[in-house]
Amino acid sequence: RSFERHFNERPFLNHACYLFLTKTTKNRNRQQSNFSTLCRGHIIPKEVRDKDTARKFLEATEQFERIMNESGFIRLSRLTDEEIIGTAETPGLIEKYFSLSLSDTTVLEDIDLRADRMRIGDKRLCLHTLSDTEDLPGLVNTDMRYERLSTDRSDCRLSFAAPVGLLLSCNHIYNQYVLIDDCAENLQRFEKNARNMHSLSRYSRSNQINKQWIDEYLNEAHSFGLTSVRCHCNVLAWSEDKEELRRIRNDVGSQLALMECKPRHNTVDVPTLFWAGIPGNEADFPAEESFYTFIEQAVCFFNE
């Protein structure tokens, strides 16, 4: 058939999505980059070793999986132990992450950490982050119109984060973090901050403006019953060629600009965020790299 010949042996983008649900503790959820497990001798908190806590978490995970699969929009399949940690013959997801490769012939490579760069084997890494509300657009949606495949009569809808997903034609990982804290405690902290800003408003107009923003956030949360969460997104791209990496860096910035986000090339936190991105190690995410929002807005940055 002609359409089969058209696609025969044509290059394509190999795309894979993984969703990790990570159980952490209250203290660890607030830790910063200078308190990573890289700096401690014991990496498992005592709260997580409690059997009852682990059982409740697994039950919640199974319920989440069932709800997502029954929705009909997306299908989740749970990874087995062998798929995560690998076997004697095949590498697991963790090995593939450390070598930045999805192939089954993965070879572990040296990791070189420098003040101005990070390298895994011959692969040079560059990182762009969305970790501040000032870098975000004023409005986010679950989907966007893709002009190149849309017409006057029909729309081609893609996810809002598609420009840094399937539409970014280079080797990269797009990470999205949604950190669920105690919502009531978050709102109480914002109430306290608002009072402090009000007290200091006579000394600076910026304090008065900050109080107004905090009040708007609190009003939205209480009026619509929204859950306060923290969010972070980053794009980790790499190349073995130095000149190609420069082009990729520009491409990532351009794709973020298509989402009306402010591209922020991060050269300092690459090792910390790479470490936090290890499958199952999301609890090591540095708290200072996140921004406050609501669940509805946070999931708009998911890539399907």
Protein language model regions, located:
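Extended, folded cores of ATP/NTP-driven motor/assembly subunits in large transport
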Residues: 1-301
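P-loop NTPase catalytic phosphate-binding loop
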Residues: 304
